[in-house]
Amino acid sequence: MQPTQADRPYSYETFPTAGNVAYFSMEIAINPSMPTYSGGLGVLAGDTLRSAADLGVPLAAFTLAHRKGYFQQHLSGAGDQTEDVQPWNPADFCTEEPARVTVSIEDRTVTVRAWRYDMVGRYGHVVPIYLLDTDVDGNSEWDRGLTDHLYGGDTNYRLQQEIVLGMGGARMAGTLGFPINVYHMNEGHAALLTLALLESQLGGGPLGAFNEADIAQVRRKCVFTTHTPVPAGHDRFSAEQAGRMLGADRTARLEKLGCFHEGLLNMTLVALRFSRYANGVALQHGKVSRAMFPEFPIDSITNGVHAPTWVSEPVQQMLDTHLPAWRRDNLYMRNAIDLPEQAMIEAHARAKEALLTEVATRTGRVLDPHVLTLGFARRAATYKRATLLFTDPDRLLKIAEQAGGLQILYAGKAHPQDEPGKALIHSVIEKAQTLSSELLRIVYLENYAWDLGALLTAGVDVWVNTPRRPYEASGTSGMKAALNGVPSLSILDGWWIEGCLEGVTGWAIEDGADDAAEAGSLYDKLEKAVVPRYKSAPEQWARMMRSTLAFNGSYFNTNRMVKQYTRNAYYPVQLLEPAHVEEPSFAG
């Protein structure tokens, strides 16, 4: 549906003194044809920018060009993953900016340019995305490849990329002709932008000349979002690496400012020490982060997803008919609780048909649209426990018999250097081949990416998530499923602690002493709750889909999330100039 003037959301013109926001992220899912993301962090960043464009937030984003992409996944019949690069040309999608900036790496001067991609919102507001690129004439062959690979190479390569993103990005932002009042670091990869801001604050003078007022000026401009729930997950570099890459003076100043922990430069500490506001990405993750970093006040803003991107075409058509304001303000989806049950059933059936058609096209496997279908698709990391469903094969087969058939769809990539992750994929495919029968059909789909993810989250009947607590900071795939009325069956971690209404939006897998105990709870929920309702109570199932969309779809979206960032992080009341208000007079 085409928006009208009356559809416009509230305007950020109510913040006339706030200025522009610069958003920094190592990866951003910008466009399905641009392989500039690897997983959840990048998809979240892309959805954040899409909602910022829809809402008219004065924001520009900075990331790396990643000319070689992430990777194309290939799976052998035995389940072994191999990878191909995904080369692409920024000139095919973006406009080159004339500006050039330089950064110093190991005493080398590296030139950085930027490619601009315009993210256009629903009402025409543009959020420009600047992709930083070191493939510039005059740079050495090595330096020209610094921005090529997303999460490629060793820790030396990673630190050099973080210098380009943080310091190069901050300098590029300063050359583009619009004032930046807020710098948002989406994870610690961009933390070194604070160092560039401090150097700018000192006017090029020696770092040793800074004082508390200088640090306060940098801190006033910076906000930080952490996505990491365990200490080992934070980017850390040795003092030797830091000194060699950044220089001895910068490294000494960072150490003096308390940015080292256990002898390592900790990028999360850099970001926290220079930020006036920090947040985790779910309520529970905020608690975990405050426990890890007790000296810092860390808020919580729960993640979301961009509803128009992830709602399937059939569900969009249903919402356009019954709740036409849902795109303007996702909170209107709360009224999905009154949708006709048959409309929900028919919309999901069409989404499921589209998914199973894609499965047949990719694999030749013909699945039954009337059979209960579970979905499990995410990065192949061991803590996500993709094989938990196979803990007791005999019990899983009995559940398939009870259901009159069960279909399980898997997808997910392992990082090229993650051998345990690759072994996990191999194990899932091996078990799928062993267990598959007429009643139990298990398919692992190759090359999980944006388009396949959208089909899966919309088309399965139940979304399964089995992370080991507390490793799931938030998770967003279940939110995409909820926007399509698909309930979750999940461990209570991350966002699901907030989103689970037992039997209403899905089911919780109970905490157990070990994997076997939690697998037992998973089987219990399938046997006693999921299968009976799906098989014998279709009206109850339709009401649950409707409730899932109404309660979780209306809240776990980036429309709500970006509004929270603007109010709590970007433009908090105490930073705005107070408006003059005339005192009321009650004189007669």
Where are these regions (language model features)?
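Catalytic cores of carbohydrate-active enzymes across secretory and cytosolic contexts
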Residues: M1-G588
